[in-house]
Amino acid sequence: MHSCWNMKLQNEKTLGHSVSRSSNISKAGSPTSVSAPSRFPRTSVTPSSQDICRICHCEGDDESPLITPCHCTGSLHFVHQACLQQWIKSSDTRCCELCKFEFIMETKLKPLRKWEKLQMTASERRKIMCSVTFHVIAITCVVWSLYVLIDRTAEEIRMGQNNGILEWPFWTKLVVVAIGFTGGLLFMYVQCKVYVQLWKRLKAYNRVIYVQNCPETCKKKIFEKSVIIEPNLESKEALGIHHSDTNSSYYTEPEDCGAAILQV
């Protein structure tokens, strides 16, 4: 009987454990019973308020700090020195494209041996090479033609001096020489303007540019810093006064006690 009673108790215990285990599993499996642990607080995702460069959208550091070169505000207020230098070199402009403020900068040319090639596409390089080749050939032909015409004209002048008469072919050649010379000068002037612009671009690309901060933005920064520092100083003074009051009260209490003891 005793053994049967023990067997019955063991069966009841096993049934109770299985029931409780199944209930725990069902609770764990149900989505409504899951609750977030209290030790892991929920964090809200907020946009970063860090200052970033308006060209590369990166933050500033000790090696490449952010500067404020113009009057733009908001997300366009800051820019890296290197990013702005590269933009000025490629665009060949000296003012902001938005607020039109002319940058305050110091320029210095690199040594000639350290000059870099102008960044151009393959089609632009091909056009420049073809243009230079055509211009060299055209200038050679014009110079040779003028030389031949001038030489023959000089011979006719000598013959005319001997005969005392200058024929029509001489005047025709003289007009052709004058027109050719004038056209050659105009052609050289137009092409020289193109090459001068190209030379300016190359010089601008090989300049070392240091852009300074806008004076007004610097004043604003100094004013903001002073406004932030002044309340801190006032709070420190208030804390110092409060601390001195507590210390004085702390030291005056024993004096009162001593006086009371003397009276006794």
From Swiss-Prot:
Ranges of compositional bias, category Polar residues: 16-47
PROSITE patterns: ZF_RING_CH
Molecular-function annotations in GO: MHC protein binding; ubiquitin protein ligase activity; ubiquitin-protein transferase activity; zinc ion binding
Binding positions for Zn(2+) 1 per the UniProt entry: 53, 56, 80, 83
Gene Ontology BP annotations: antigen processing and presentation of peptide antigen via MHC class II; immune response; protein polyubiquitination
Record flagged with keyword NAD: no
UniProt membrane topology term: Multi-pass membrane protein
InterPro entries: Znf_RING, Znf_RING-CH, Znf_RING/FYVE/PHD
Cellular location(s): Cytoplasmic vesicle membrane; Lysosome membrane; Early endosome membrane
Span list, region Disordered: 15-47
Pfam families: RINGv
Chain sites annotated for binding Zn(2+) 2: 70, 72, 96, 99
Entry's Gene Ontology cellular component terms: cytoplasm; early endosome membrane; endosome; late endosome membrane; lysosomal membrane; lysosome
Major site of localization recorded for this protein: membrane
Transmembrane stretches, start-end: 130-150, 170-190
EC code(s) of this entry: 2.3.2.27
Domain of life, source organism: Eukaryota
Zinc finger (RING-CH-type): 45-106
Catalytic activity: S-ubiquitinyl-[E2 ubiquitin-conjugating enzyme]-L-cysteine + [acceptor protein]-L-lysine = [E2 ubiquitin-conjugating enzyme]-L-cysteine + N(6)-ubiquitinyl-[acceptor protein]-L-lysine
Pathway listed: Protein modification; protein ubiquitination
Disulphides: none
Keywords assigned: Cytoplasmic vesicle, Endosome, Immunity, Lysosome, Membrane, Metal-binding, Transferase, Transmembrane, Transmembrane helix, Ubl conjugation pathway, Zinc, Zinc-finger
Function: E3 ubiquitin-protein ligase that mediates ubiquitination of cd86 and MHC class II proteins, such as hla-dr alpha and beta, and promotes their subsequent endocytosis and sorting to lysosomes via multivesicular bodies.
Domain remark in the UniProt entry: The RING-CH-type zinc finger domain is required for E3 ligase activity.
Name assigned to this protein: E3 ubiquitin-protein ligase MARCHF8
Biological source species: Xenopus laevis
